[in-house]
Amino acid sequence: MPRRRVVATREILPDPKFGSQTIAKFINHVMVDGKKSTAERIVYGALEQVAEKRNIEDPVAFFEEVLENVRPMVEVKARRVGGATYQVPMEVRPSRRTALAMRWLADAASKRSEKSMAHRLAGELGDASEGKGSAVKKRDEVHRMADANKAFSHYRF
């Protein structure tokens, strides 16, 4: 085992509008080139649009629900055994689940065709809440890969 000390996880400051660490983390995922105020405007605008469209009182709870729809439970990792590389299904730890869900939501939103990023993000959040959209599709694809490679689960690390 390495003798280095364990690195402490950084405490992320909650976002100014909702006081939520989850939304602050998502703003950081949406941010490009260090432009945080632009990313905040995009995320808050998207949450407002979705709240208006669907008559939602608590956008933070809605966002948590969307994240839960996108979070992967299992993923595949490459494992080399005797010259062959196997895709071994592994359970995803909670912090990585959330990080992957946020990354997939941000990527899926940026690939949509609406005019502004706030509109794209609002559309993707709406679709993800209904269990459709590119981010949910990505999660299902990862789950399918893990299911297809279930035979190699005895190679776990």
Swiss-Prot record:
GO terms (BP aspect): translation
Record keywords, A-Z: Ribonucleoprotein, Ribosomal protein, RNA-binding, rRNA-binding, tRNA-binding
The species this protein was found in: Psychrobacter sp. (strain PRwf-1)
Disulphide bridges, residue numbers: none
Protein name: Small ribosomal subunit protein uS7
Gene: rpsG
Quaternary organization: Part of the 30S ribosomal subunit. Contacts proteins S9 and S11.
Keyword Kinase: no
Record's GO cellular component terms: small ribosomal subunit
Phylogenetic classification of the source organism: Bacteria, Pseudomonadati, Pseudomonadota, Gammaproteobacteria, Moraxellales
Superkingdom, taxonomy of origin: Bacteria
A molecular-function term among this protein's GO annotations: structural constituent of ribosome
Annotated InterPro entries: Ribosomal_uS7 (IPR000235), Ribosomal_uS7_bac/org-type (IPR005717), Ribosomal_uS7_CS (IPR020606), Ribosomal_uS7_dom (IPR023798), Ribosomal_uS7_dom_sf (IPR036823)
Gene3D superfamilies: Ribosomal protein S7 domain (1.10.455.10)
